[in-house]
Every structure is written in C-alpha cells, then in structure tokens.
Amino acid sequence: MGIVLKKGQKVDLTKGNASLKKVIIGLGWDVNKYDGGHDFDLDAVAFCCGEDGKVHNEADMIFYNNLKHSSGAVEHLGDNLTGDGDGDDEQILIDLSSIPQHINKIDFTVTIHEAEERKQNFGQVSNSYVRVVNSDTKEELIKYDLGEDFSIETAIVVAELYRNGSEWKFNAIGSGFEGGLAALCKNFGLNV
C-alpha cells in the first residue's frame, strides 16, 4: 500500500523514482441507495492545463467523448455508466514521459451526468477516492479518500498532477463545484 493523503497534501511522484513512466489514475465511488427514479452516471474528466491553469482548447479535455489526448500521453480507459462493482470505476492512463511541455498540470475531476435533471448531487455518493498506480507493476503509490464532505455539489476537482521542474507531483484537492461539467469547463477556460 502506498502513501495515504489528506485534502491539501502534496507528494512527489517521480522524485527518487526515475523509472516511473506510466501511471493509472483510478477513481472510484459508491452511490447511496435511494429511490430517485434515475441511475447515477458519474464521469471522470481530465483537464490538461498550461501554466495559467487553463486548457488551450477542447482537445485538452479528456473524457468519454474524447478518450485520448492528441499526444497520446493521457487516455481515458472507458466510461462506466453505473459505478457498480468493486475497485476503480473509471481509470485514466498517464504516460509521464510523453506529456507535451506546454501542459504543466493535469486536473482530475468527477461530474454527475445530468445531475440537475435527475436531482442528484455528491451528497448521495460515498466512498469516493482517487489513487495512483504504477502501470507496469500495478503497485498502488498514492491514495486519497475524499470523505463525505460534499452535499449539493455536482462536480469535484479530485486531484492534480503538476510539474515541479523536471519532476511530477500529486496534489489531493477535493474541491466541489455546483453546475456540473459546464462549471468545470468554465473554470478551466472552456466555453460550453
């Protein structure tokens, strides 16, 4: 088992681990059982940002409709429509050695699909986590449990990978947003 982080903690990912080239960002959650008439569909989204914290264009947003960055460095491994089952619900593969120089950080977020229409929010989601796994060895390097701090939010910035010189660090963020995917897009410089 790797390092367990709390909200706001940062840790070196590649410093002292020069052989680490590919990691899997695993995101998981459970939906509290309630009869709202609709299934929950949570979606992982990665925003590949420049120094200003914004994406350059829509191609820097990796999600169920754009599964792979043009550089090949960031790849969403598929949309889980129900969140059922144990383990990671969605995964994003990161090739650290292929990330273009203009990308200084990658923010990992989770949104609830059609949250407003379905009257759903993160207060109805539990056991949320993000973890970083060495893609080659399958060793879990880092885990951050988000806890139960959310109520009316429909989107969360879970964590980020960011450049620190020639190294990569991981930051446990856990910041909630109202307004779902549209609010996140605006936050990262996209107009939808």
Swiss-Prot record:
Q: Which domain of life is it from?
A: Bacteria
User: InterPro entries under this entry?
Assistant: Stress/Tellurium_Resist, TerD
Pfam families this protein is in?
TerD
Q: Which PANTHER family match?
A: CAMP-BINDING PROTEIN 1-RELATED, GENERAL STRESS PROTEIN 16U
Family from the record: Belongs to the CAPAB/TerDEXZ family.
Write out the function statement from the record.
Not known; could confer methyl methane sulfonate (MMS), mitomycin C (MC), and UV resistance.
Instruction: Write the protein's name.
Output: Chemical-damaging agent resistance protein C
The species is: Clostridium acetobutylicum
Q: What is the lineage of its organism?
A: Bacteria, Bacillati, Bacillota, Clostridia, Eubacteriales
